[in-house]
């Protein structure tokens, strides 16, 4: 059965009304929800805010082991340290290496672009930061619905966005409703914020419908791989940040590598593009760190 046929047979869907609906419980979506509730409280207004998150919990689909500038966090929560935000590992060193097939050379700091300098930043697990932000959002009265993906954009008769519908549950491989079938619900709102991240499936629909990419440069994307390694204490350099360029890519290929020393003897190693991720591990610059250690997890993003 098609989704429309299922709706015709089992509908109408239950609908819930909110002032603001945010699709996506990542750092951007949660920051928007938190700020809206903060502004409403400052003006003594009641504004209902709901966040729809497809992951089983906030942070479940966050893959980045990132370097974070705390400026935005400070603007959102000036007392984030007292609140226990998981930004505990400041950057202690920052290097950019150009790799060749057999060696490497460190780029002098004076030649490194300002955007690549990480003084005052923190090496974090973004998943942990998102989970903490979700707790803060709920404390402010934000409703978070984890485990529900937005499947369809809903429009008014005039063509304006009025919300989204969640996907049906319990659909068999054939497309027919199964034993645990549950019809999706509609979330209506005065304002809908789409915070799906890059290449969100609803975002692509909206871009096409409203021609948001007309007369714009095409966006470009690359797939990368990140691995989490456990290193011996003697090799750990908590807070050390390393970025690489050059080998194994040629001069016409965009991409590069990163190596972030986290707390607890963990290292986040990644490379964009993913096709070079296994090759770059063999470089002498990385082998000096990766010898006799073990990989805990691997993600593509």
Predicted feature locations:
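Predominantly flavin-linked oxidoreductase catalytic cores and closely associated redox partners
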Residues: 43-45, 127, 131, 136-299
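Extended hydrophobic secondary-structure segments that form protein cores and membrane-embedded regions
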Residues: 20, 48-56, 189-194
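Short, solvent-exposed loop/turn and secondary-structure capping segments
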Residues: 61-63, 108-109, 204-207
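N-terminal FAD cofactor-binding segment of flavoenzymes
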Residues: 46-103
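Aromatic- and Gly/Pro-rich amphipathic surface segment
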Residues: 89-117, 121-122, 127
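Extreme N-terminal leader/targeting segments of oxidoreductases
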Residues: 1-21, 35-48, 98, 171
